[in-house]
Each structure stands twice: as structure tokens, then as C-alpha cells.
């Protein structure tokens, strides 16, 4: 059985494929600390949603998401995260949308300097597919973990 795992670095994503030996990466980016001069004027993500669209290389039938708050000194509180097949631009196919859970809960808090991985979720992901990841934040750090090339 093929599996996929998506690692999400605060606003950046990594997708991983599972084999009998373990998980294998299919999309990746590196987490970075933010440089204040590169942040938008208002970077407050509290009570906002962010959608990141990634193009995976391999597909599978299971997905997980890993979120990182490794470079922040404040916790991140996430109300929910859902994934869906991305259509044109940032539109999604609503029939494909599925919510992720963390320890069987939709809401998750990521402590400062830590990462967390979602529960495995059955999901039909095709090779080279565009996947939309939508994160609904309750509160987020003023200086987040980012990837400077991803201005989402």
C-alpha cells in the first residue's frame, strides 16, 4: 500500500511517500528563521487562514502533515487544517477536501521550538498533482518559522 506524508514548515510544505521501509520525500523546502526586514508590514496570522499549493512528485493513498515551529519563541495554535486537490490558481475541488487530525483532534498547539505530525489520513494523491493545504490559525507567533522564498 502506498502512503504519502506532507511535512508543512509553518507556511511551507514537504510531501513524503511511504514504502514498506518508511517514508520517502516527494516535495520539500527548508525551514528558516525570518529576517524582520523581509516580513510583510502586517504579518499577524492570528485568526486568519493560509492556503499553500504544492505540486507533489509521487502519489499515494495516505497522507500526513508535519508542522514546524522550530525557529519561533512563541506557540502556534491551529484551529484546523484541511487538504484538497488544487484546481486553477488557489481554488480547490471541495469534494476532495479532508480535515487532518493531530492525536485524533482537529485543533493543535505547536510549542515554540517544536514540530508535530498529523495522524495518517486516507487520501488519493496522484503523481504530479497540485495539493492545496489550508491552515486556519487561532494564534501564531509574530516571528514565525518560514521559507523566505514562500510568500504565502
Please place each PLM-identified region on the residue numbering.
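Bacterial Sec-dependent N-terminal signal peptides
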Residues: 1-23
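N-terminal secretory targeting modules
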Residues: 19-152
Amino acid at each position: 500500500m502506498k502512503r504519502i506524508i506532507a511535512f508543512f514548515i509553518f507556511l511551507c510544505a514537504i510531501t513524503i511517500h511511504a514504502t514498506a521501509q518508511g517514508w520517502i520525500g516527494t516535495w520539500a523546502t527548508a525551514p528558516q528563521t525570518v529576517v524582520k526586514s523581509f516580513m510583510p508590514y502586517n504579518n499577524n496570522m492570528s485568526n486568519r487562514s493560509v492556503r499553500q499549493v504544492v505540486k507533489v512528485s509521487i502519489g499515494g493513498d495516505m497522507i500526513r502533515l508535519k508542522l514546524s515551529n522550530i525557529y519561533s519563541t512563541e506557540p502556534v495554535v491551529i484551529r484546523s487544517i484541511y487538504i484538497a486537490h488544487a484546481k486553477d490558481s488557489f481554488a480547490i475541488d471541495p469534494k476532495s477536501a479532508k480535515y487532518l487530525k493531530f492525536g485524533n483532534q482537529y485543533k493543535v498547539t505547536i510549542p515554540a521550538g517544536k514540530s508535530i505530525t498529523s495522524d495518517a489520513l486516507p487520501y488519493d494523491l496522484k503523481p504530479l498533482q497540485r495539493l492545496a493545504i489550508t491552515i486556519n490559525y487561532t494564534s501564531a507567533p509574530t516571528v514565525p518559522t518560514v521559507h523566505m522564498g514562500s510568500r504565502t
